[in-house]
Swiss-Prot record:
Catalyzes the attachment of proline to tRNA(Pro) in a two-step reaction: proline is first activated by ATP to form Pro-AMP and then transferred to the acceptor end of tRNA(Pro). The gene is proS. It is found in: Cytoplasm. This is Proline--tRNA ligase. Pfam families: HGTP_anticodon, tRNA-synt_2b. One of its GO terms (molecular function) is proline-tRNA ligase activity. Homodimer.
Length: 439
């Protein structure tokens, strides 16, 4: 993509309405625009990051055996009355009526709808286990939306729903999602810690929140520092095998949100030097809720003996749009965003330091075409801005690799390669650049 043809409305000043780093940098970098309180338009740069995150989530869900579908944003109120949650959910749920006076709601979550789909088609235990997921926009009418995408009213979320014949099988499904989440967040360059948490309006008696430690987080957390060094399973993990050792390794080290924090256990189990009390950002949460929805909505299957019994369920959410903000909170410096490579909107930025110079223009064009041909996401700054402004833009939007091309270096057949994560620079041969940066 040529920057001269890209829509990148960068702001020079810090927006006054932005209270935290991620909100400020997303607005300054031209990633989004607020259209109403807690509702944003995703501009091209932000949209590219959103799609990268969404794809990682999708790949790890598929790897764990979940199957993608897509449910609508609007749901029938009668489904929620059937589960008993319509009146219990509260003012965060946006309730509307169509022209025929049918009561609808803009879905804040999808347990009822997926249970209705399941019960319409699945009648036997032989069709289990089953895990269905979708990635869809949701709406919760927060009383005080703030912090940009961290606490917006409209947000993109992945939610998966597992169906199993009994509790033992359901806990295996829960464990698969637990491990899938560890891998998902690690691929994004995040250290997300699973912590015991309240189940809230979803229900059930088992839940873990996945928390990224950050002082700007809304959740108070307590944990043993040892959890920060636990290994994340690699891509060879066998989701059909026994995942219990992995789960035990991660859950045997104390980590809890303040809602379920056990001070006595914390002080008895965690050495004082290892105690960490801080704040964090919730980027995902998983639940096992047993027969909560299958009982009320009569989602039964015939067991091996032919007797109908309610299925055991779980739900598993990832805040896809919230992750954009969480990554920025964890990965930034005074100059701007520092994107991990897997979620960066572009992997490489080519900076033409003397636009109009024939040799520099030709070298940049050649690099741009060769990198693009290799499948590299590349942004070529071919504008007539001065070099300092180009450096500032590249740092602000956080492109992992910057290729600095100017007449002085080209005279020796070299370009300067800058790594955004640590600011390191090196001179390399122009002829070696593509091989160095192509995956």
């Amino acid at each position: 993509m040529r920057l001269s043809r890209f829509f990148l409305p960068i702001l020079k000043e810090n927006p006054k309405e932005a209270e935290i780093v991620s909100h400020r940098l997303m607005l300054r970098a031209g990633m989004l625009r607020q259209e109403a309180a807690g509702i944003y338009a995703w501009l091209p740069l932000g949209h590219r990051v959103l799609k990268k995150i969404e794809q990682i989530v999708r790949e790890e869900q598929n790897r764990a055996g979940a199957i993608e579908l897509l449910m609508p944003t609007l749901q029938l109120a009668d489904l929620w009355r059937e589960s008993g949650r319509y009146d219990a959910y509260g003012p965060e749920m946006l309730r509307i009526s169509d022209r025929h006076k049918r009561e609808l709601l803009y879905g804040p979550t999808n347990e009822e709808m997926i249970t209705e789909i399941f019960r319409a088609y699945v009648k036997s235990y032989k069709s289990l286990p089953l895990n269905l997921y979708h990635i869809q926009w949701k709406f919760r009418d927060e009383q005080r939306p703030r912090f940009g995408v961290m606490r917006g009213r409209e947000f993109l979320m992945k939610d998966a729903y597992s169906f199993d014949v009994d509790e033992a099988a359901a806990r295996k499904s829960y464990n698969r999602m637990f491990v899938a989440y560890l891998r998902t967040f690690a691929r994004m360059g995040l250290k997300a810690i699973p912590m015991r948490a309240e189940t809230g309006p979803i229900g059930g008696d088992l839940s873990h929140e996945f928390i990224v430690l950050a002082e700007t987080g809304e959740s108070g957390v307590y944990c043993d520092r040892d959890v920060l060094s636990l290994p994340v399973p690699d891509e060879t993990v066998d989701y059909d095998g026994d995942l219990t050792p992995i789960i035990k390794q991660w859950t045997s080290v104390y980590a809890a949100t303040e809602d379920v924090h056990d001070a006595v256990r914390y002080e008895s189990e965690v050495p004082e030097a290892n105690r960490l009390h801080t704040r964090g950002i919730e980027v995902g949460q998983i639940f096992y809720f047993g027969t909560k929805y299958s009982d009320s909505m009569k989602a039964n299957v015939a067991g091996p003996d032919g007797t109908d019994a309610p299925i055991h369920g779980g739900s598993y959410g990832v805040g896809v749009s919230r992750l954009v903000g969480a990554i920025i909170e964890a990965c930034h410096d005074d100059n701007g965003i520092i994107w991990p490579e897997e979620v960066a909107p572009f992997r490489v930025a080519i900076l033409n330091l003397k636009q109009g110079d024939a040799a520099t223009d030709a070298a940049c064009e050649q690099l741009y075409k060769e990198l693009a041909a290799k499948g590299v996401d590349v942004l070529y700054d071919d504008t007539d801005q001065r070099a300092g402004a180009k450096f500032a833009t590249a740092d602000l939007i956080g492109i992992p690799w910057q290729v600095l091309v100017g007449p002085k270096g080209l005279a020796d057949g070299k370009i300067e390669l800058k790594r955004r994560s640590d600011g390191s620079r090196e001179n390399i041969a122009l002829a070696e650049t593509v091989a160095r940066l192509a995956p």
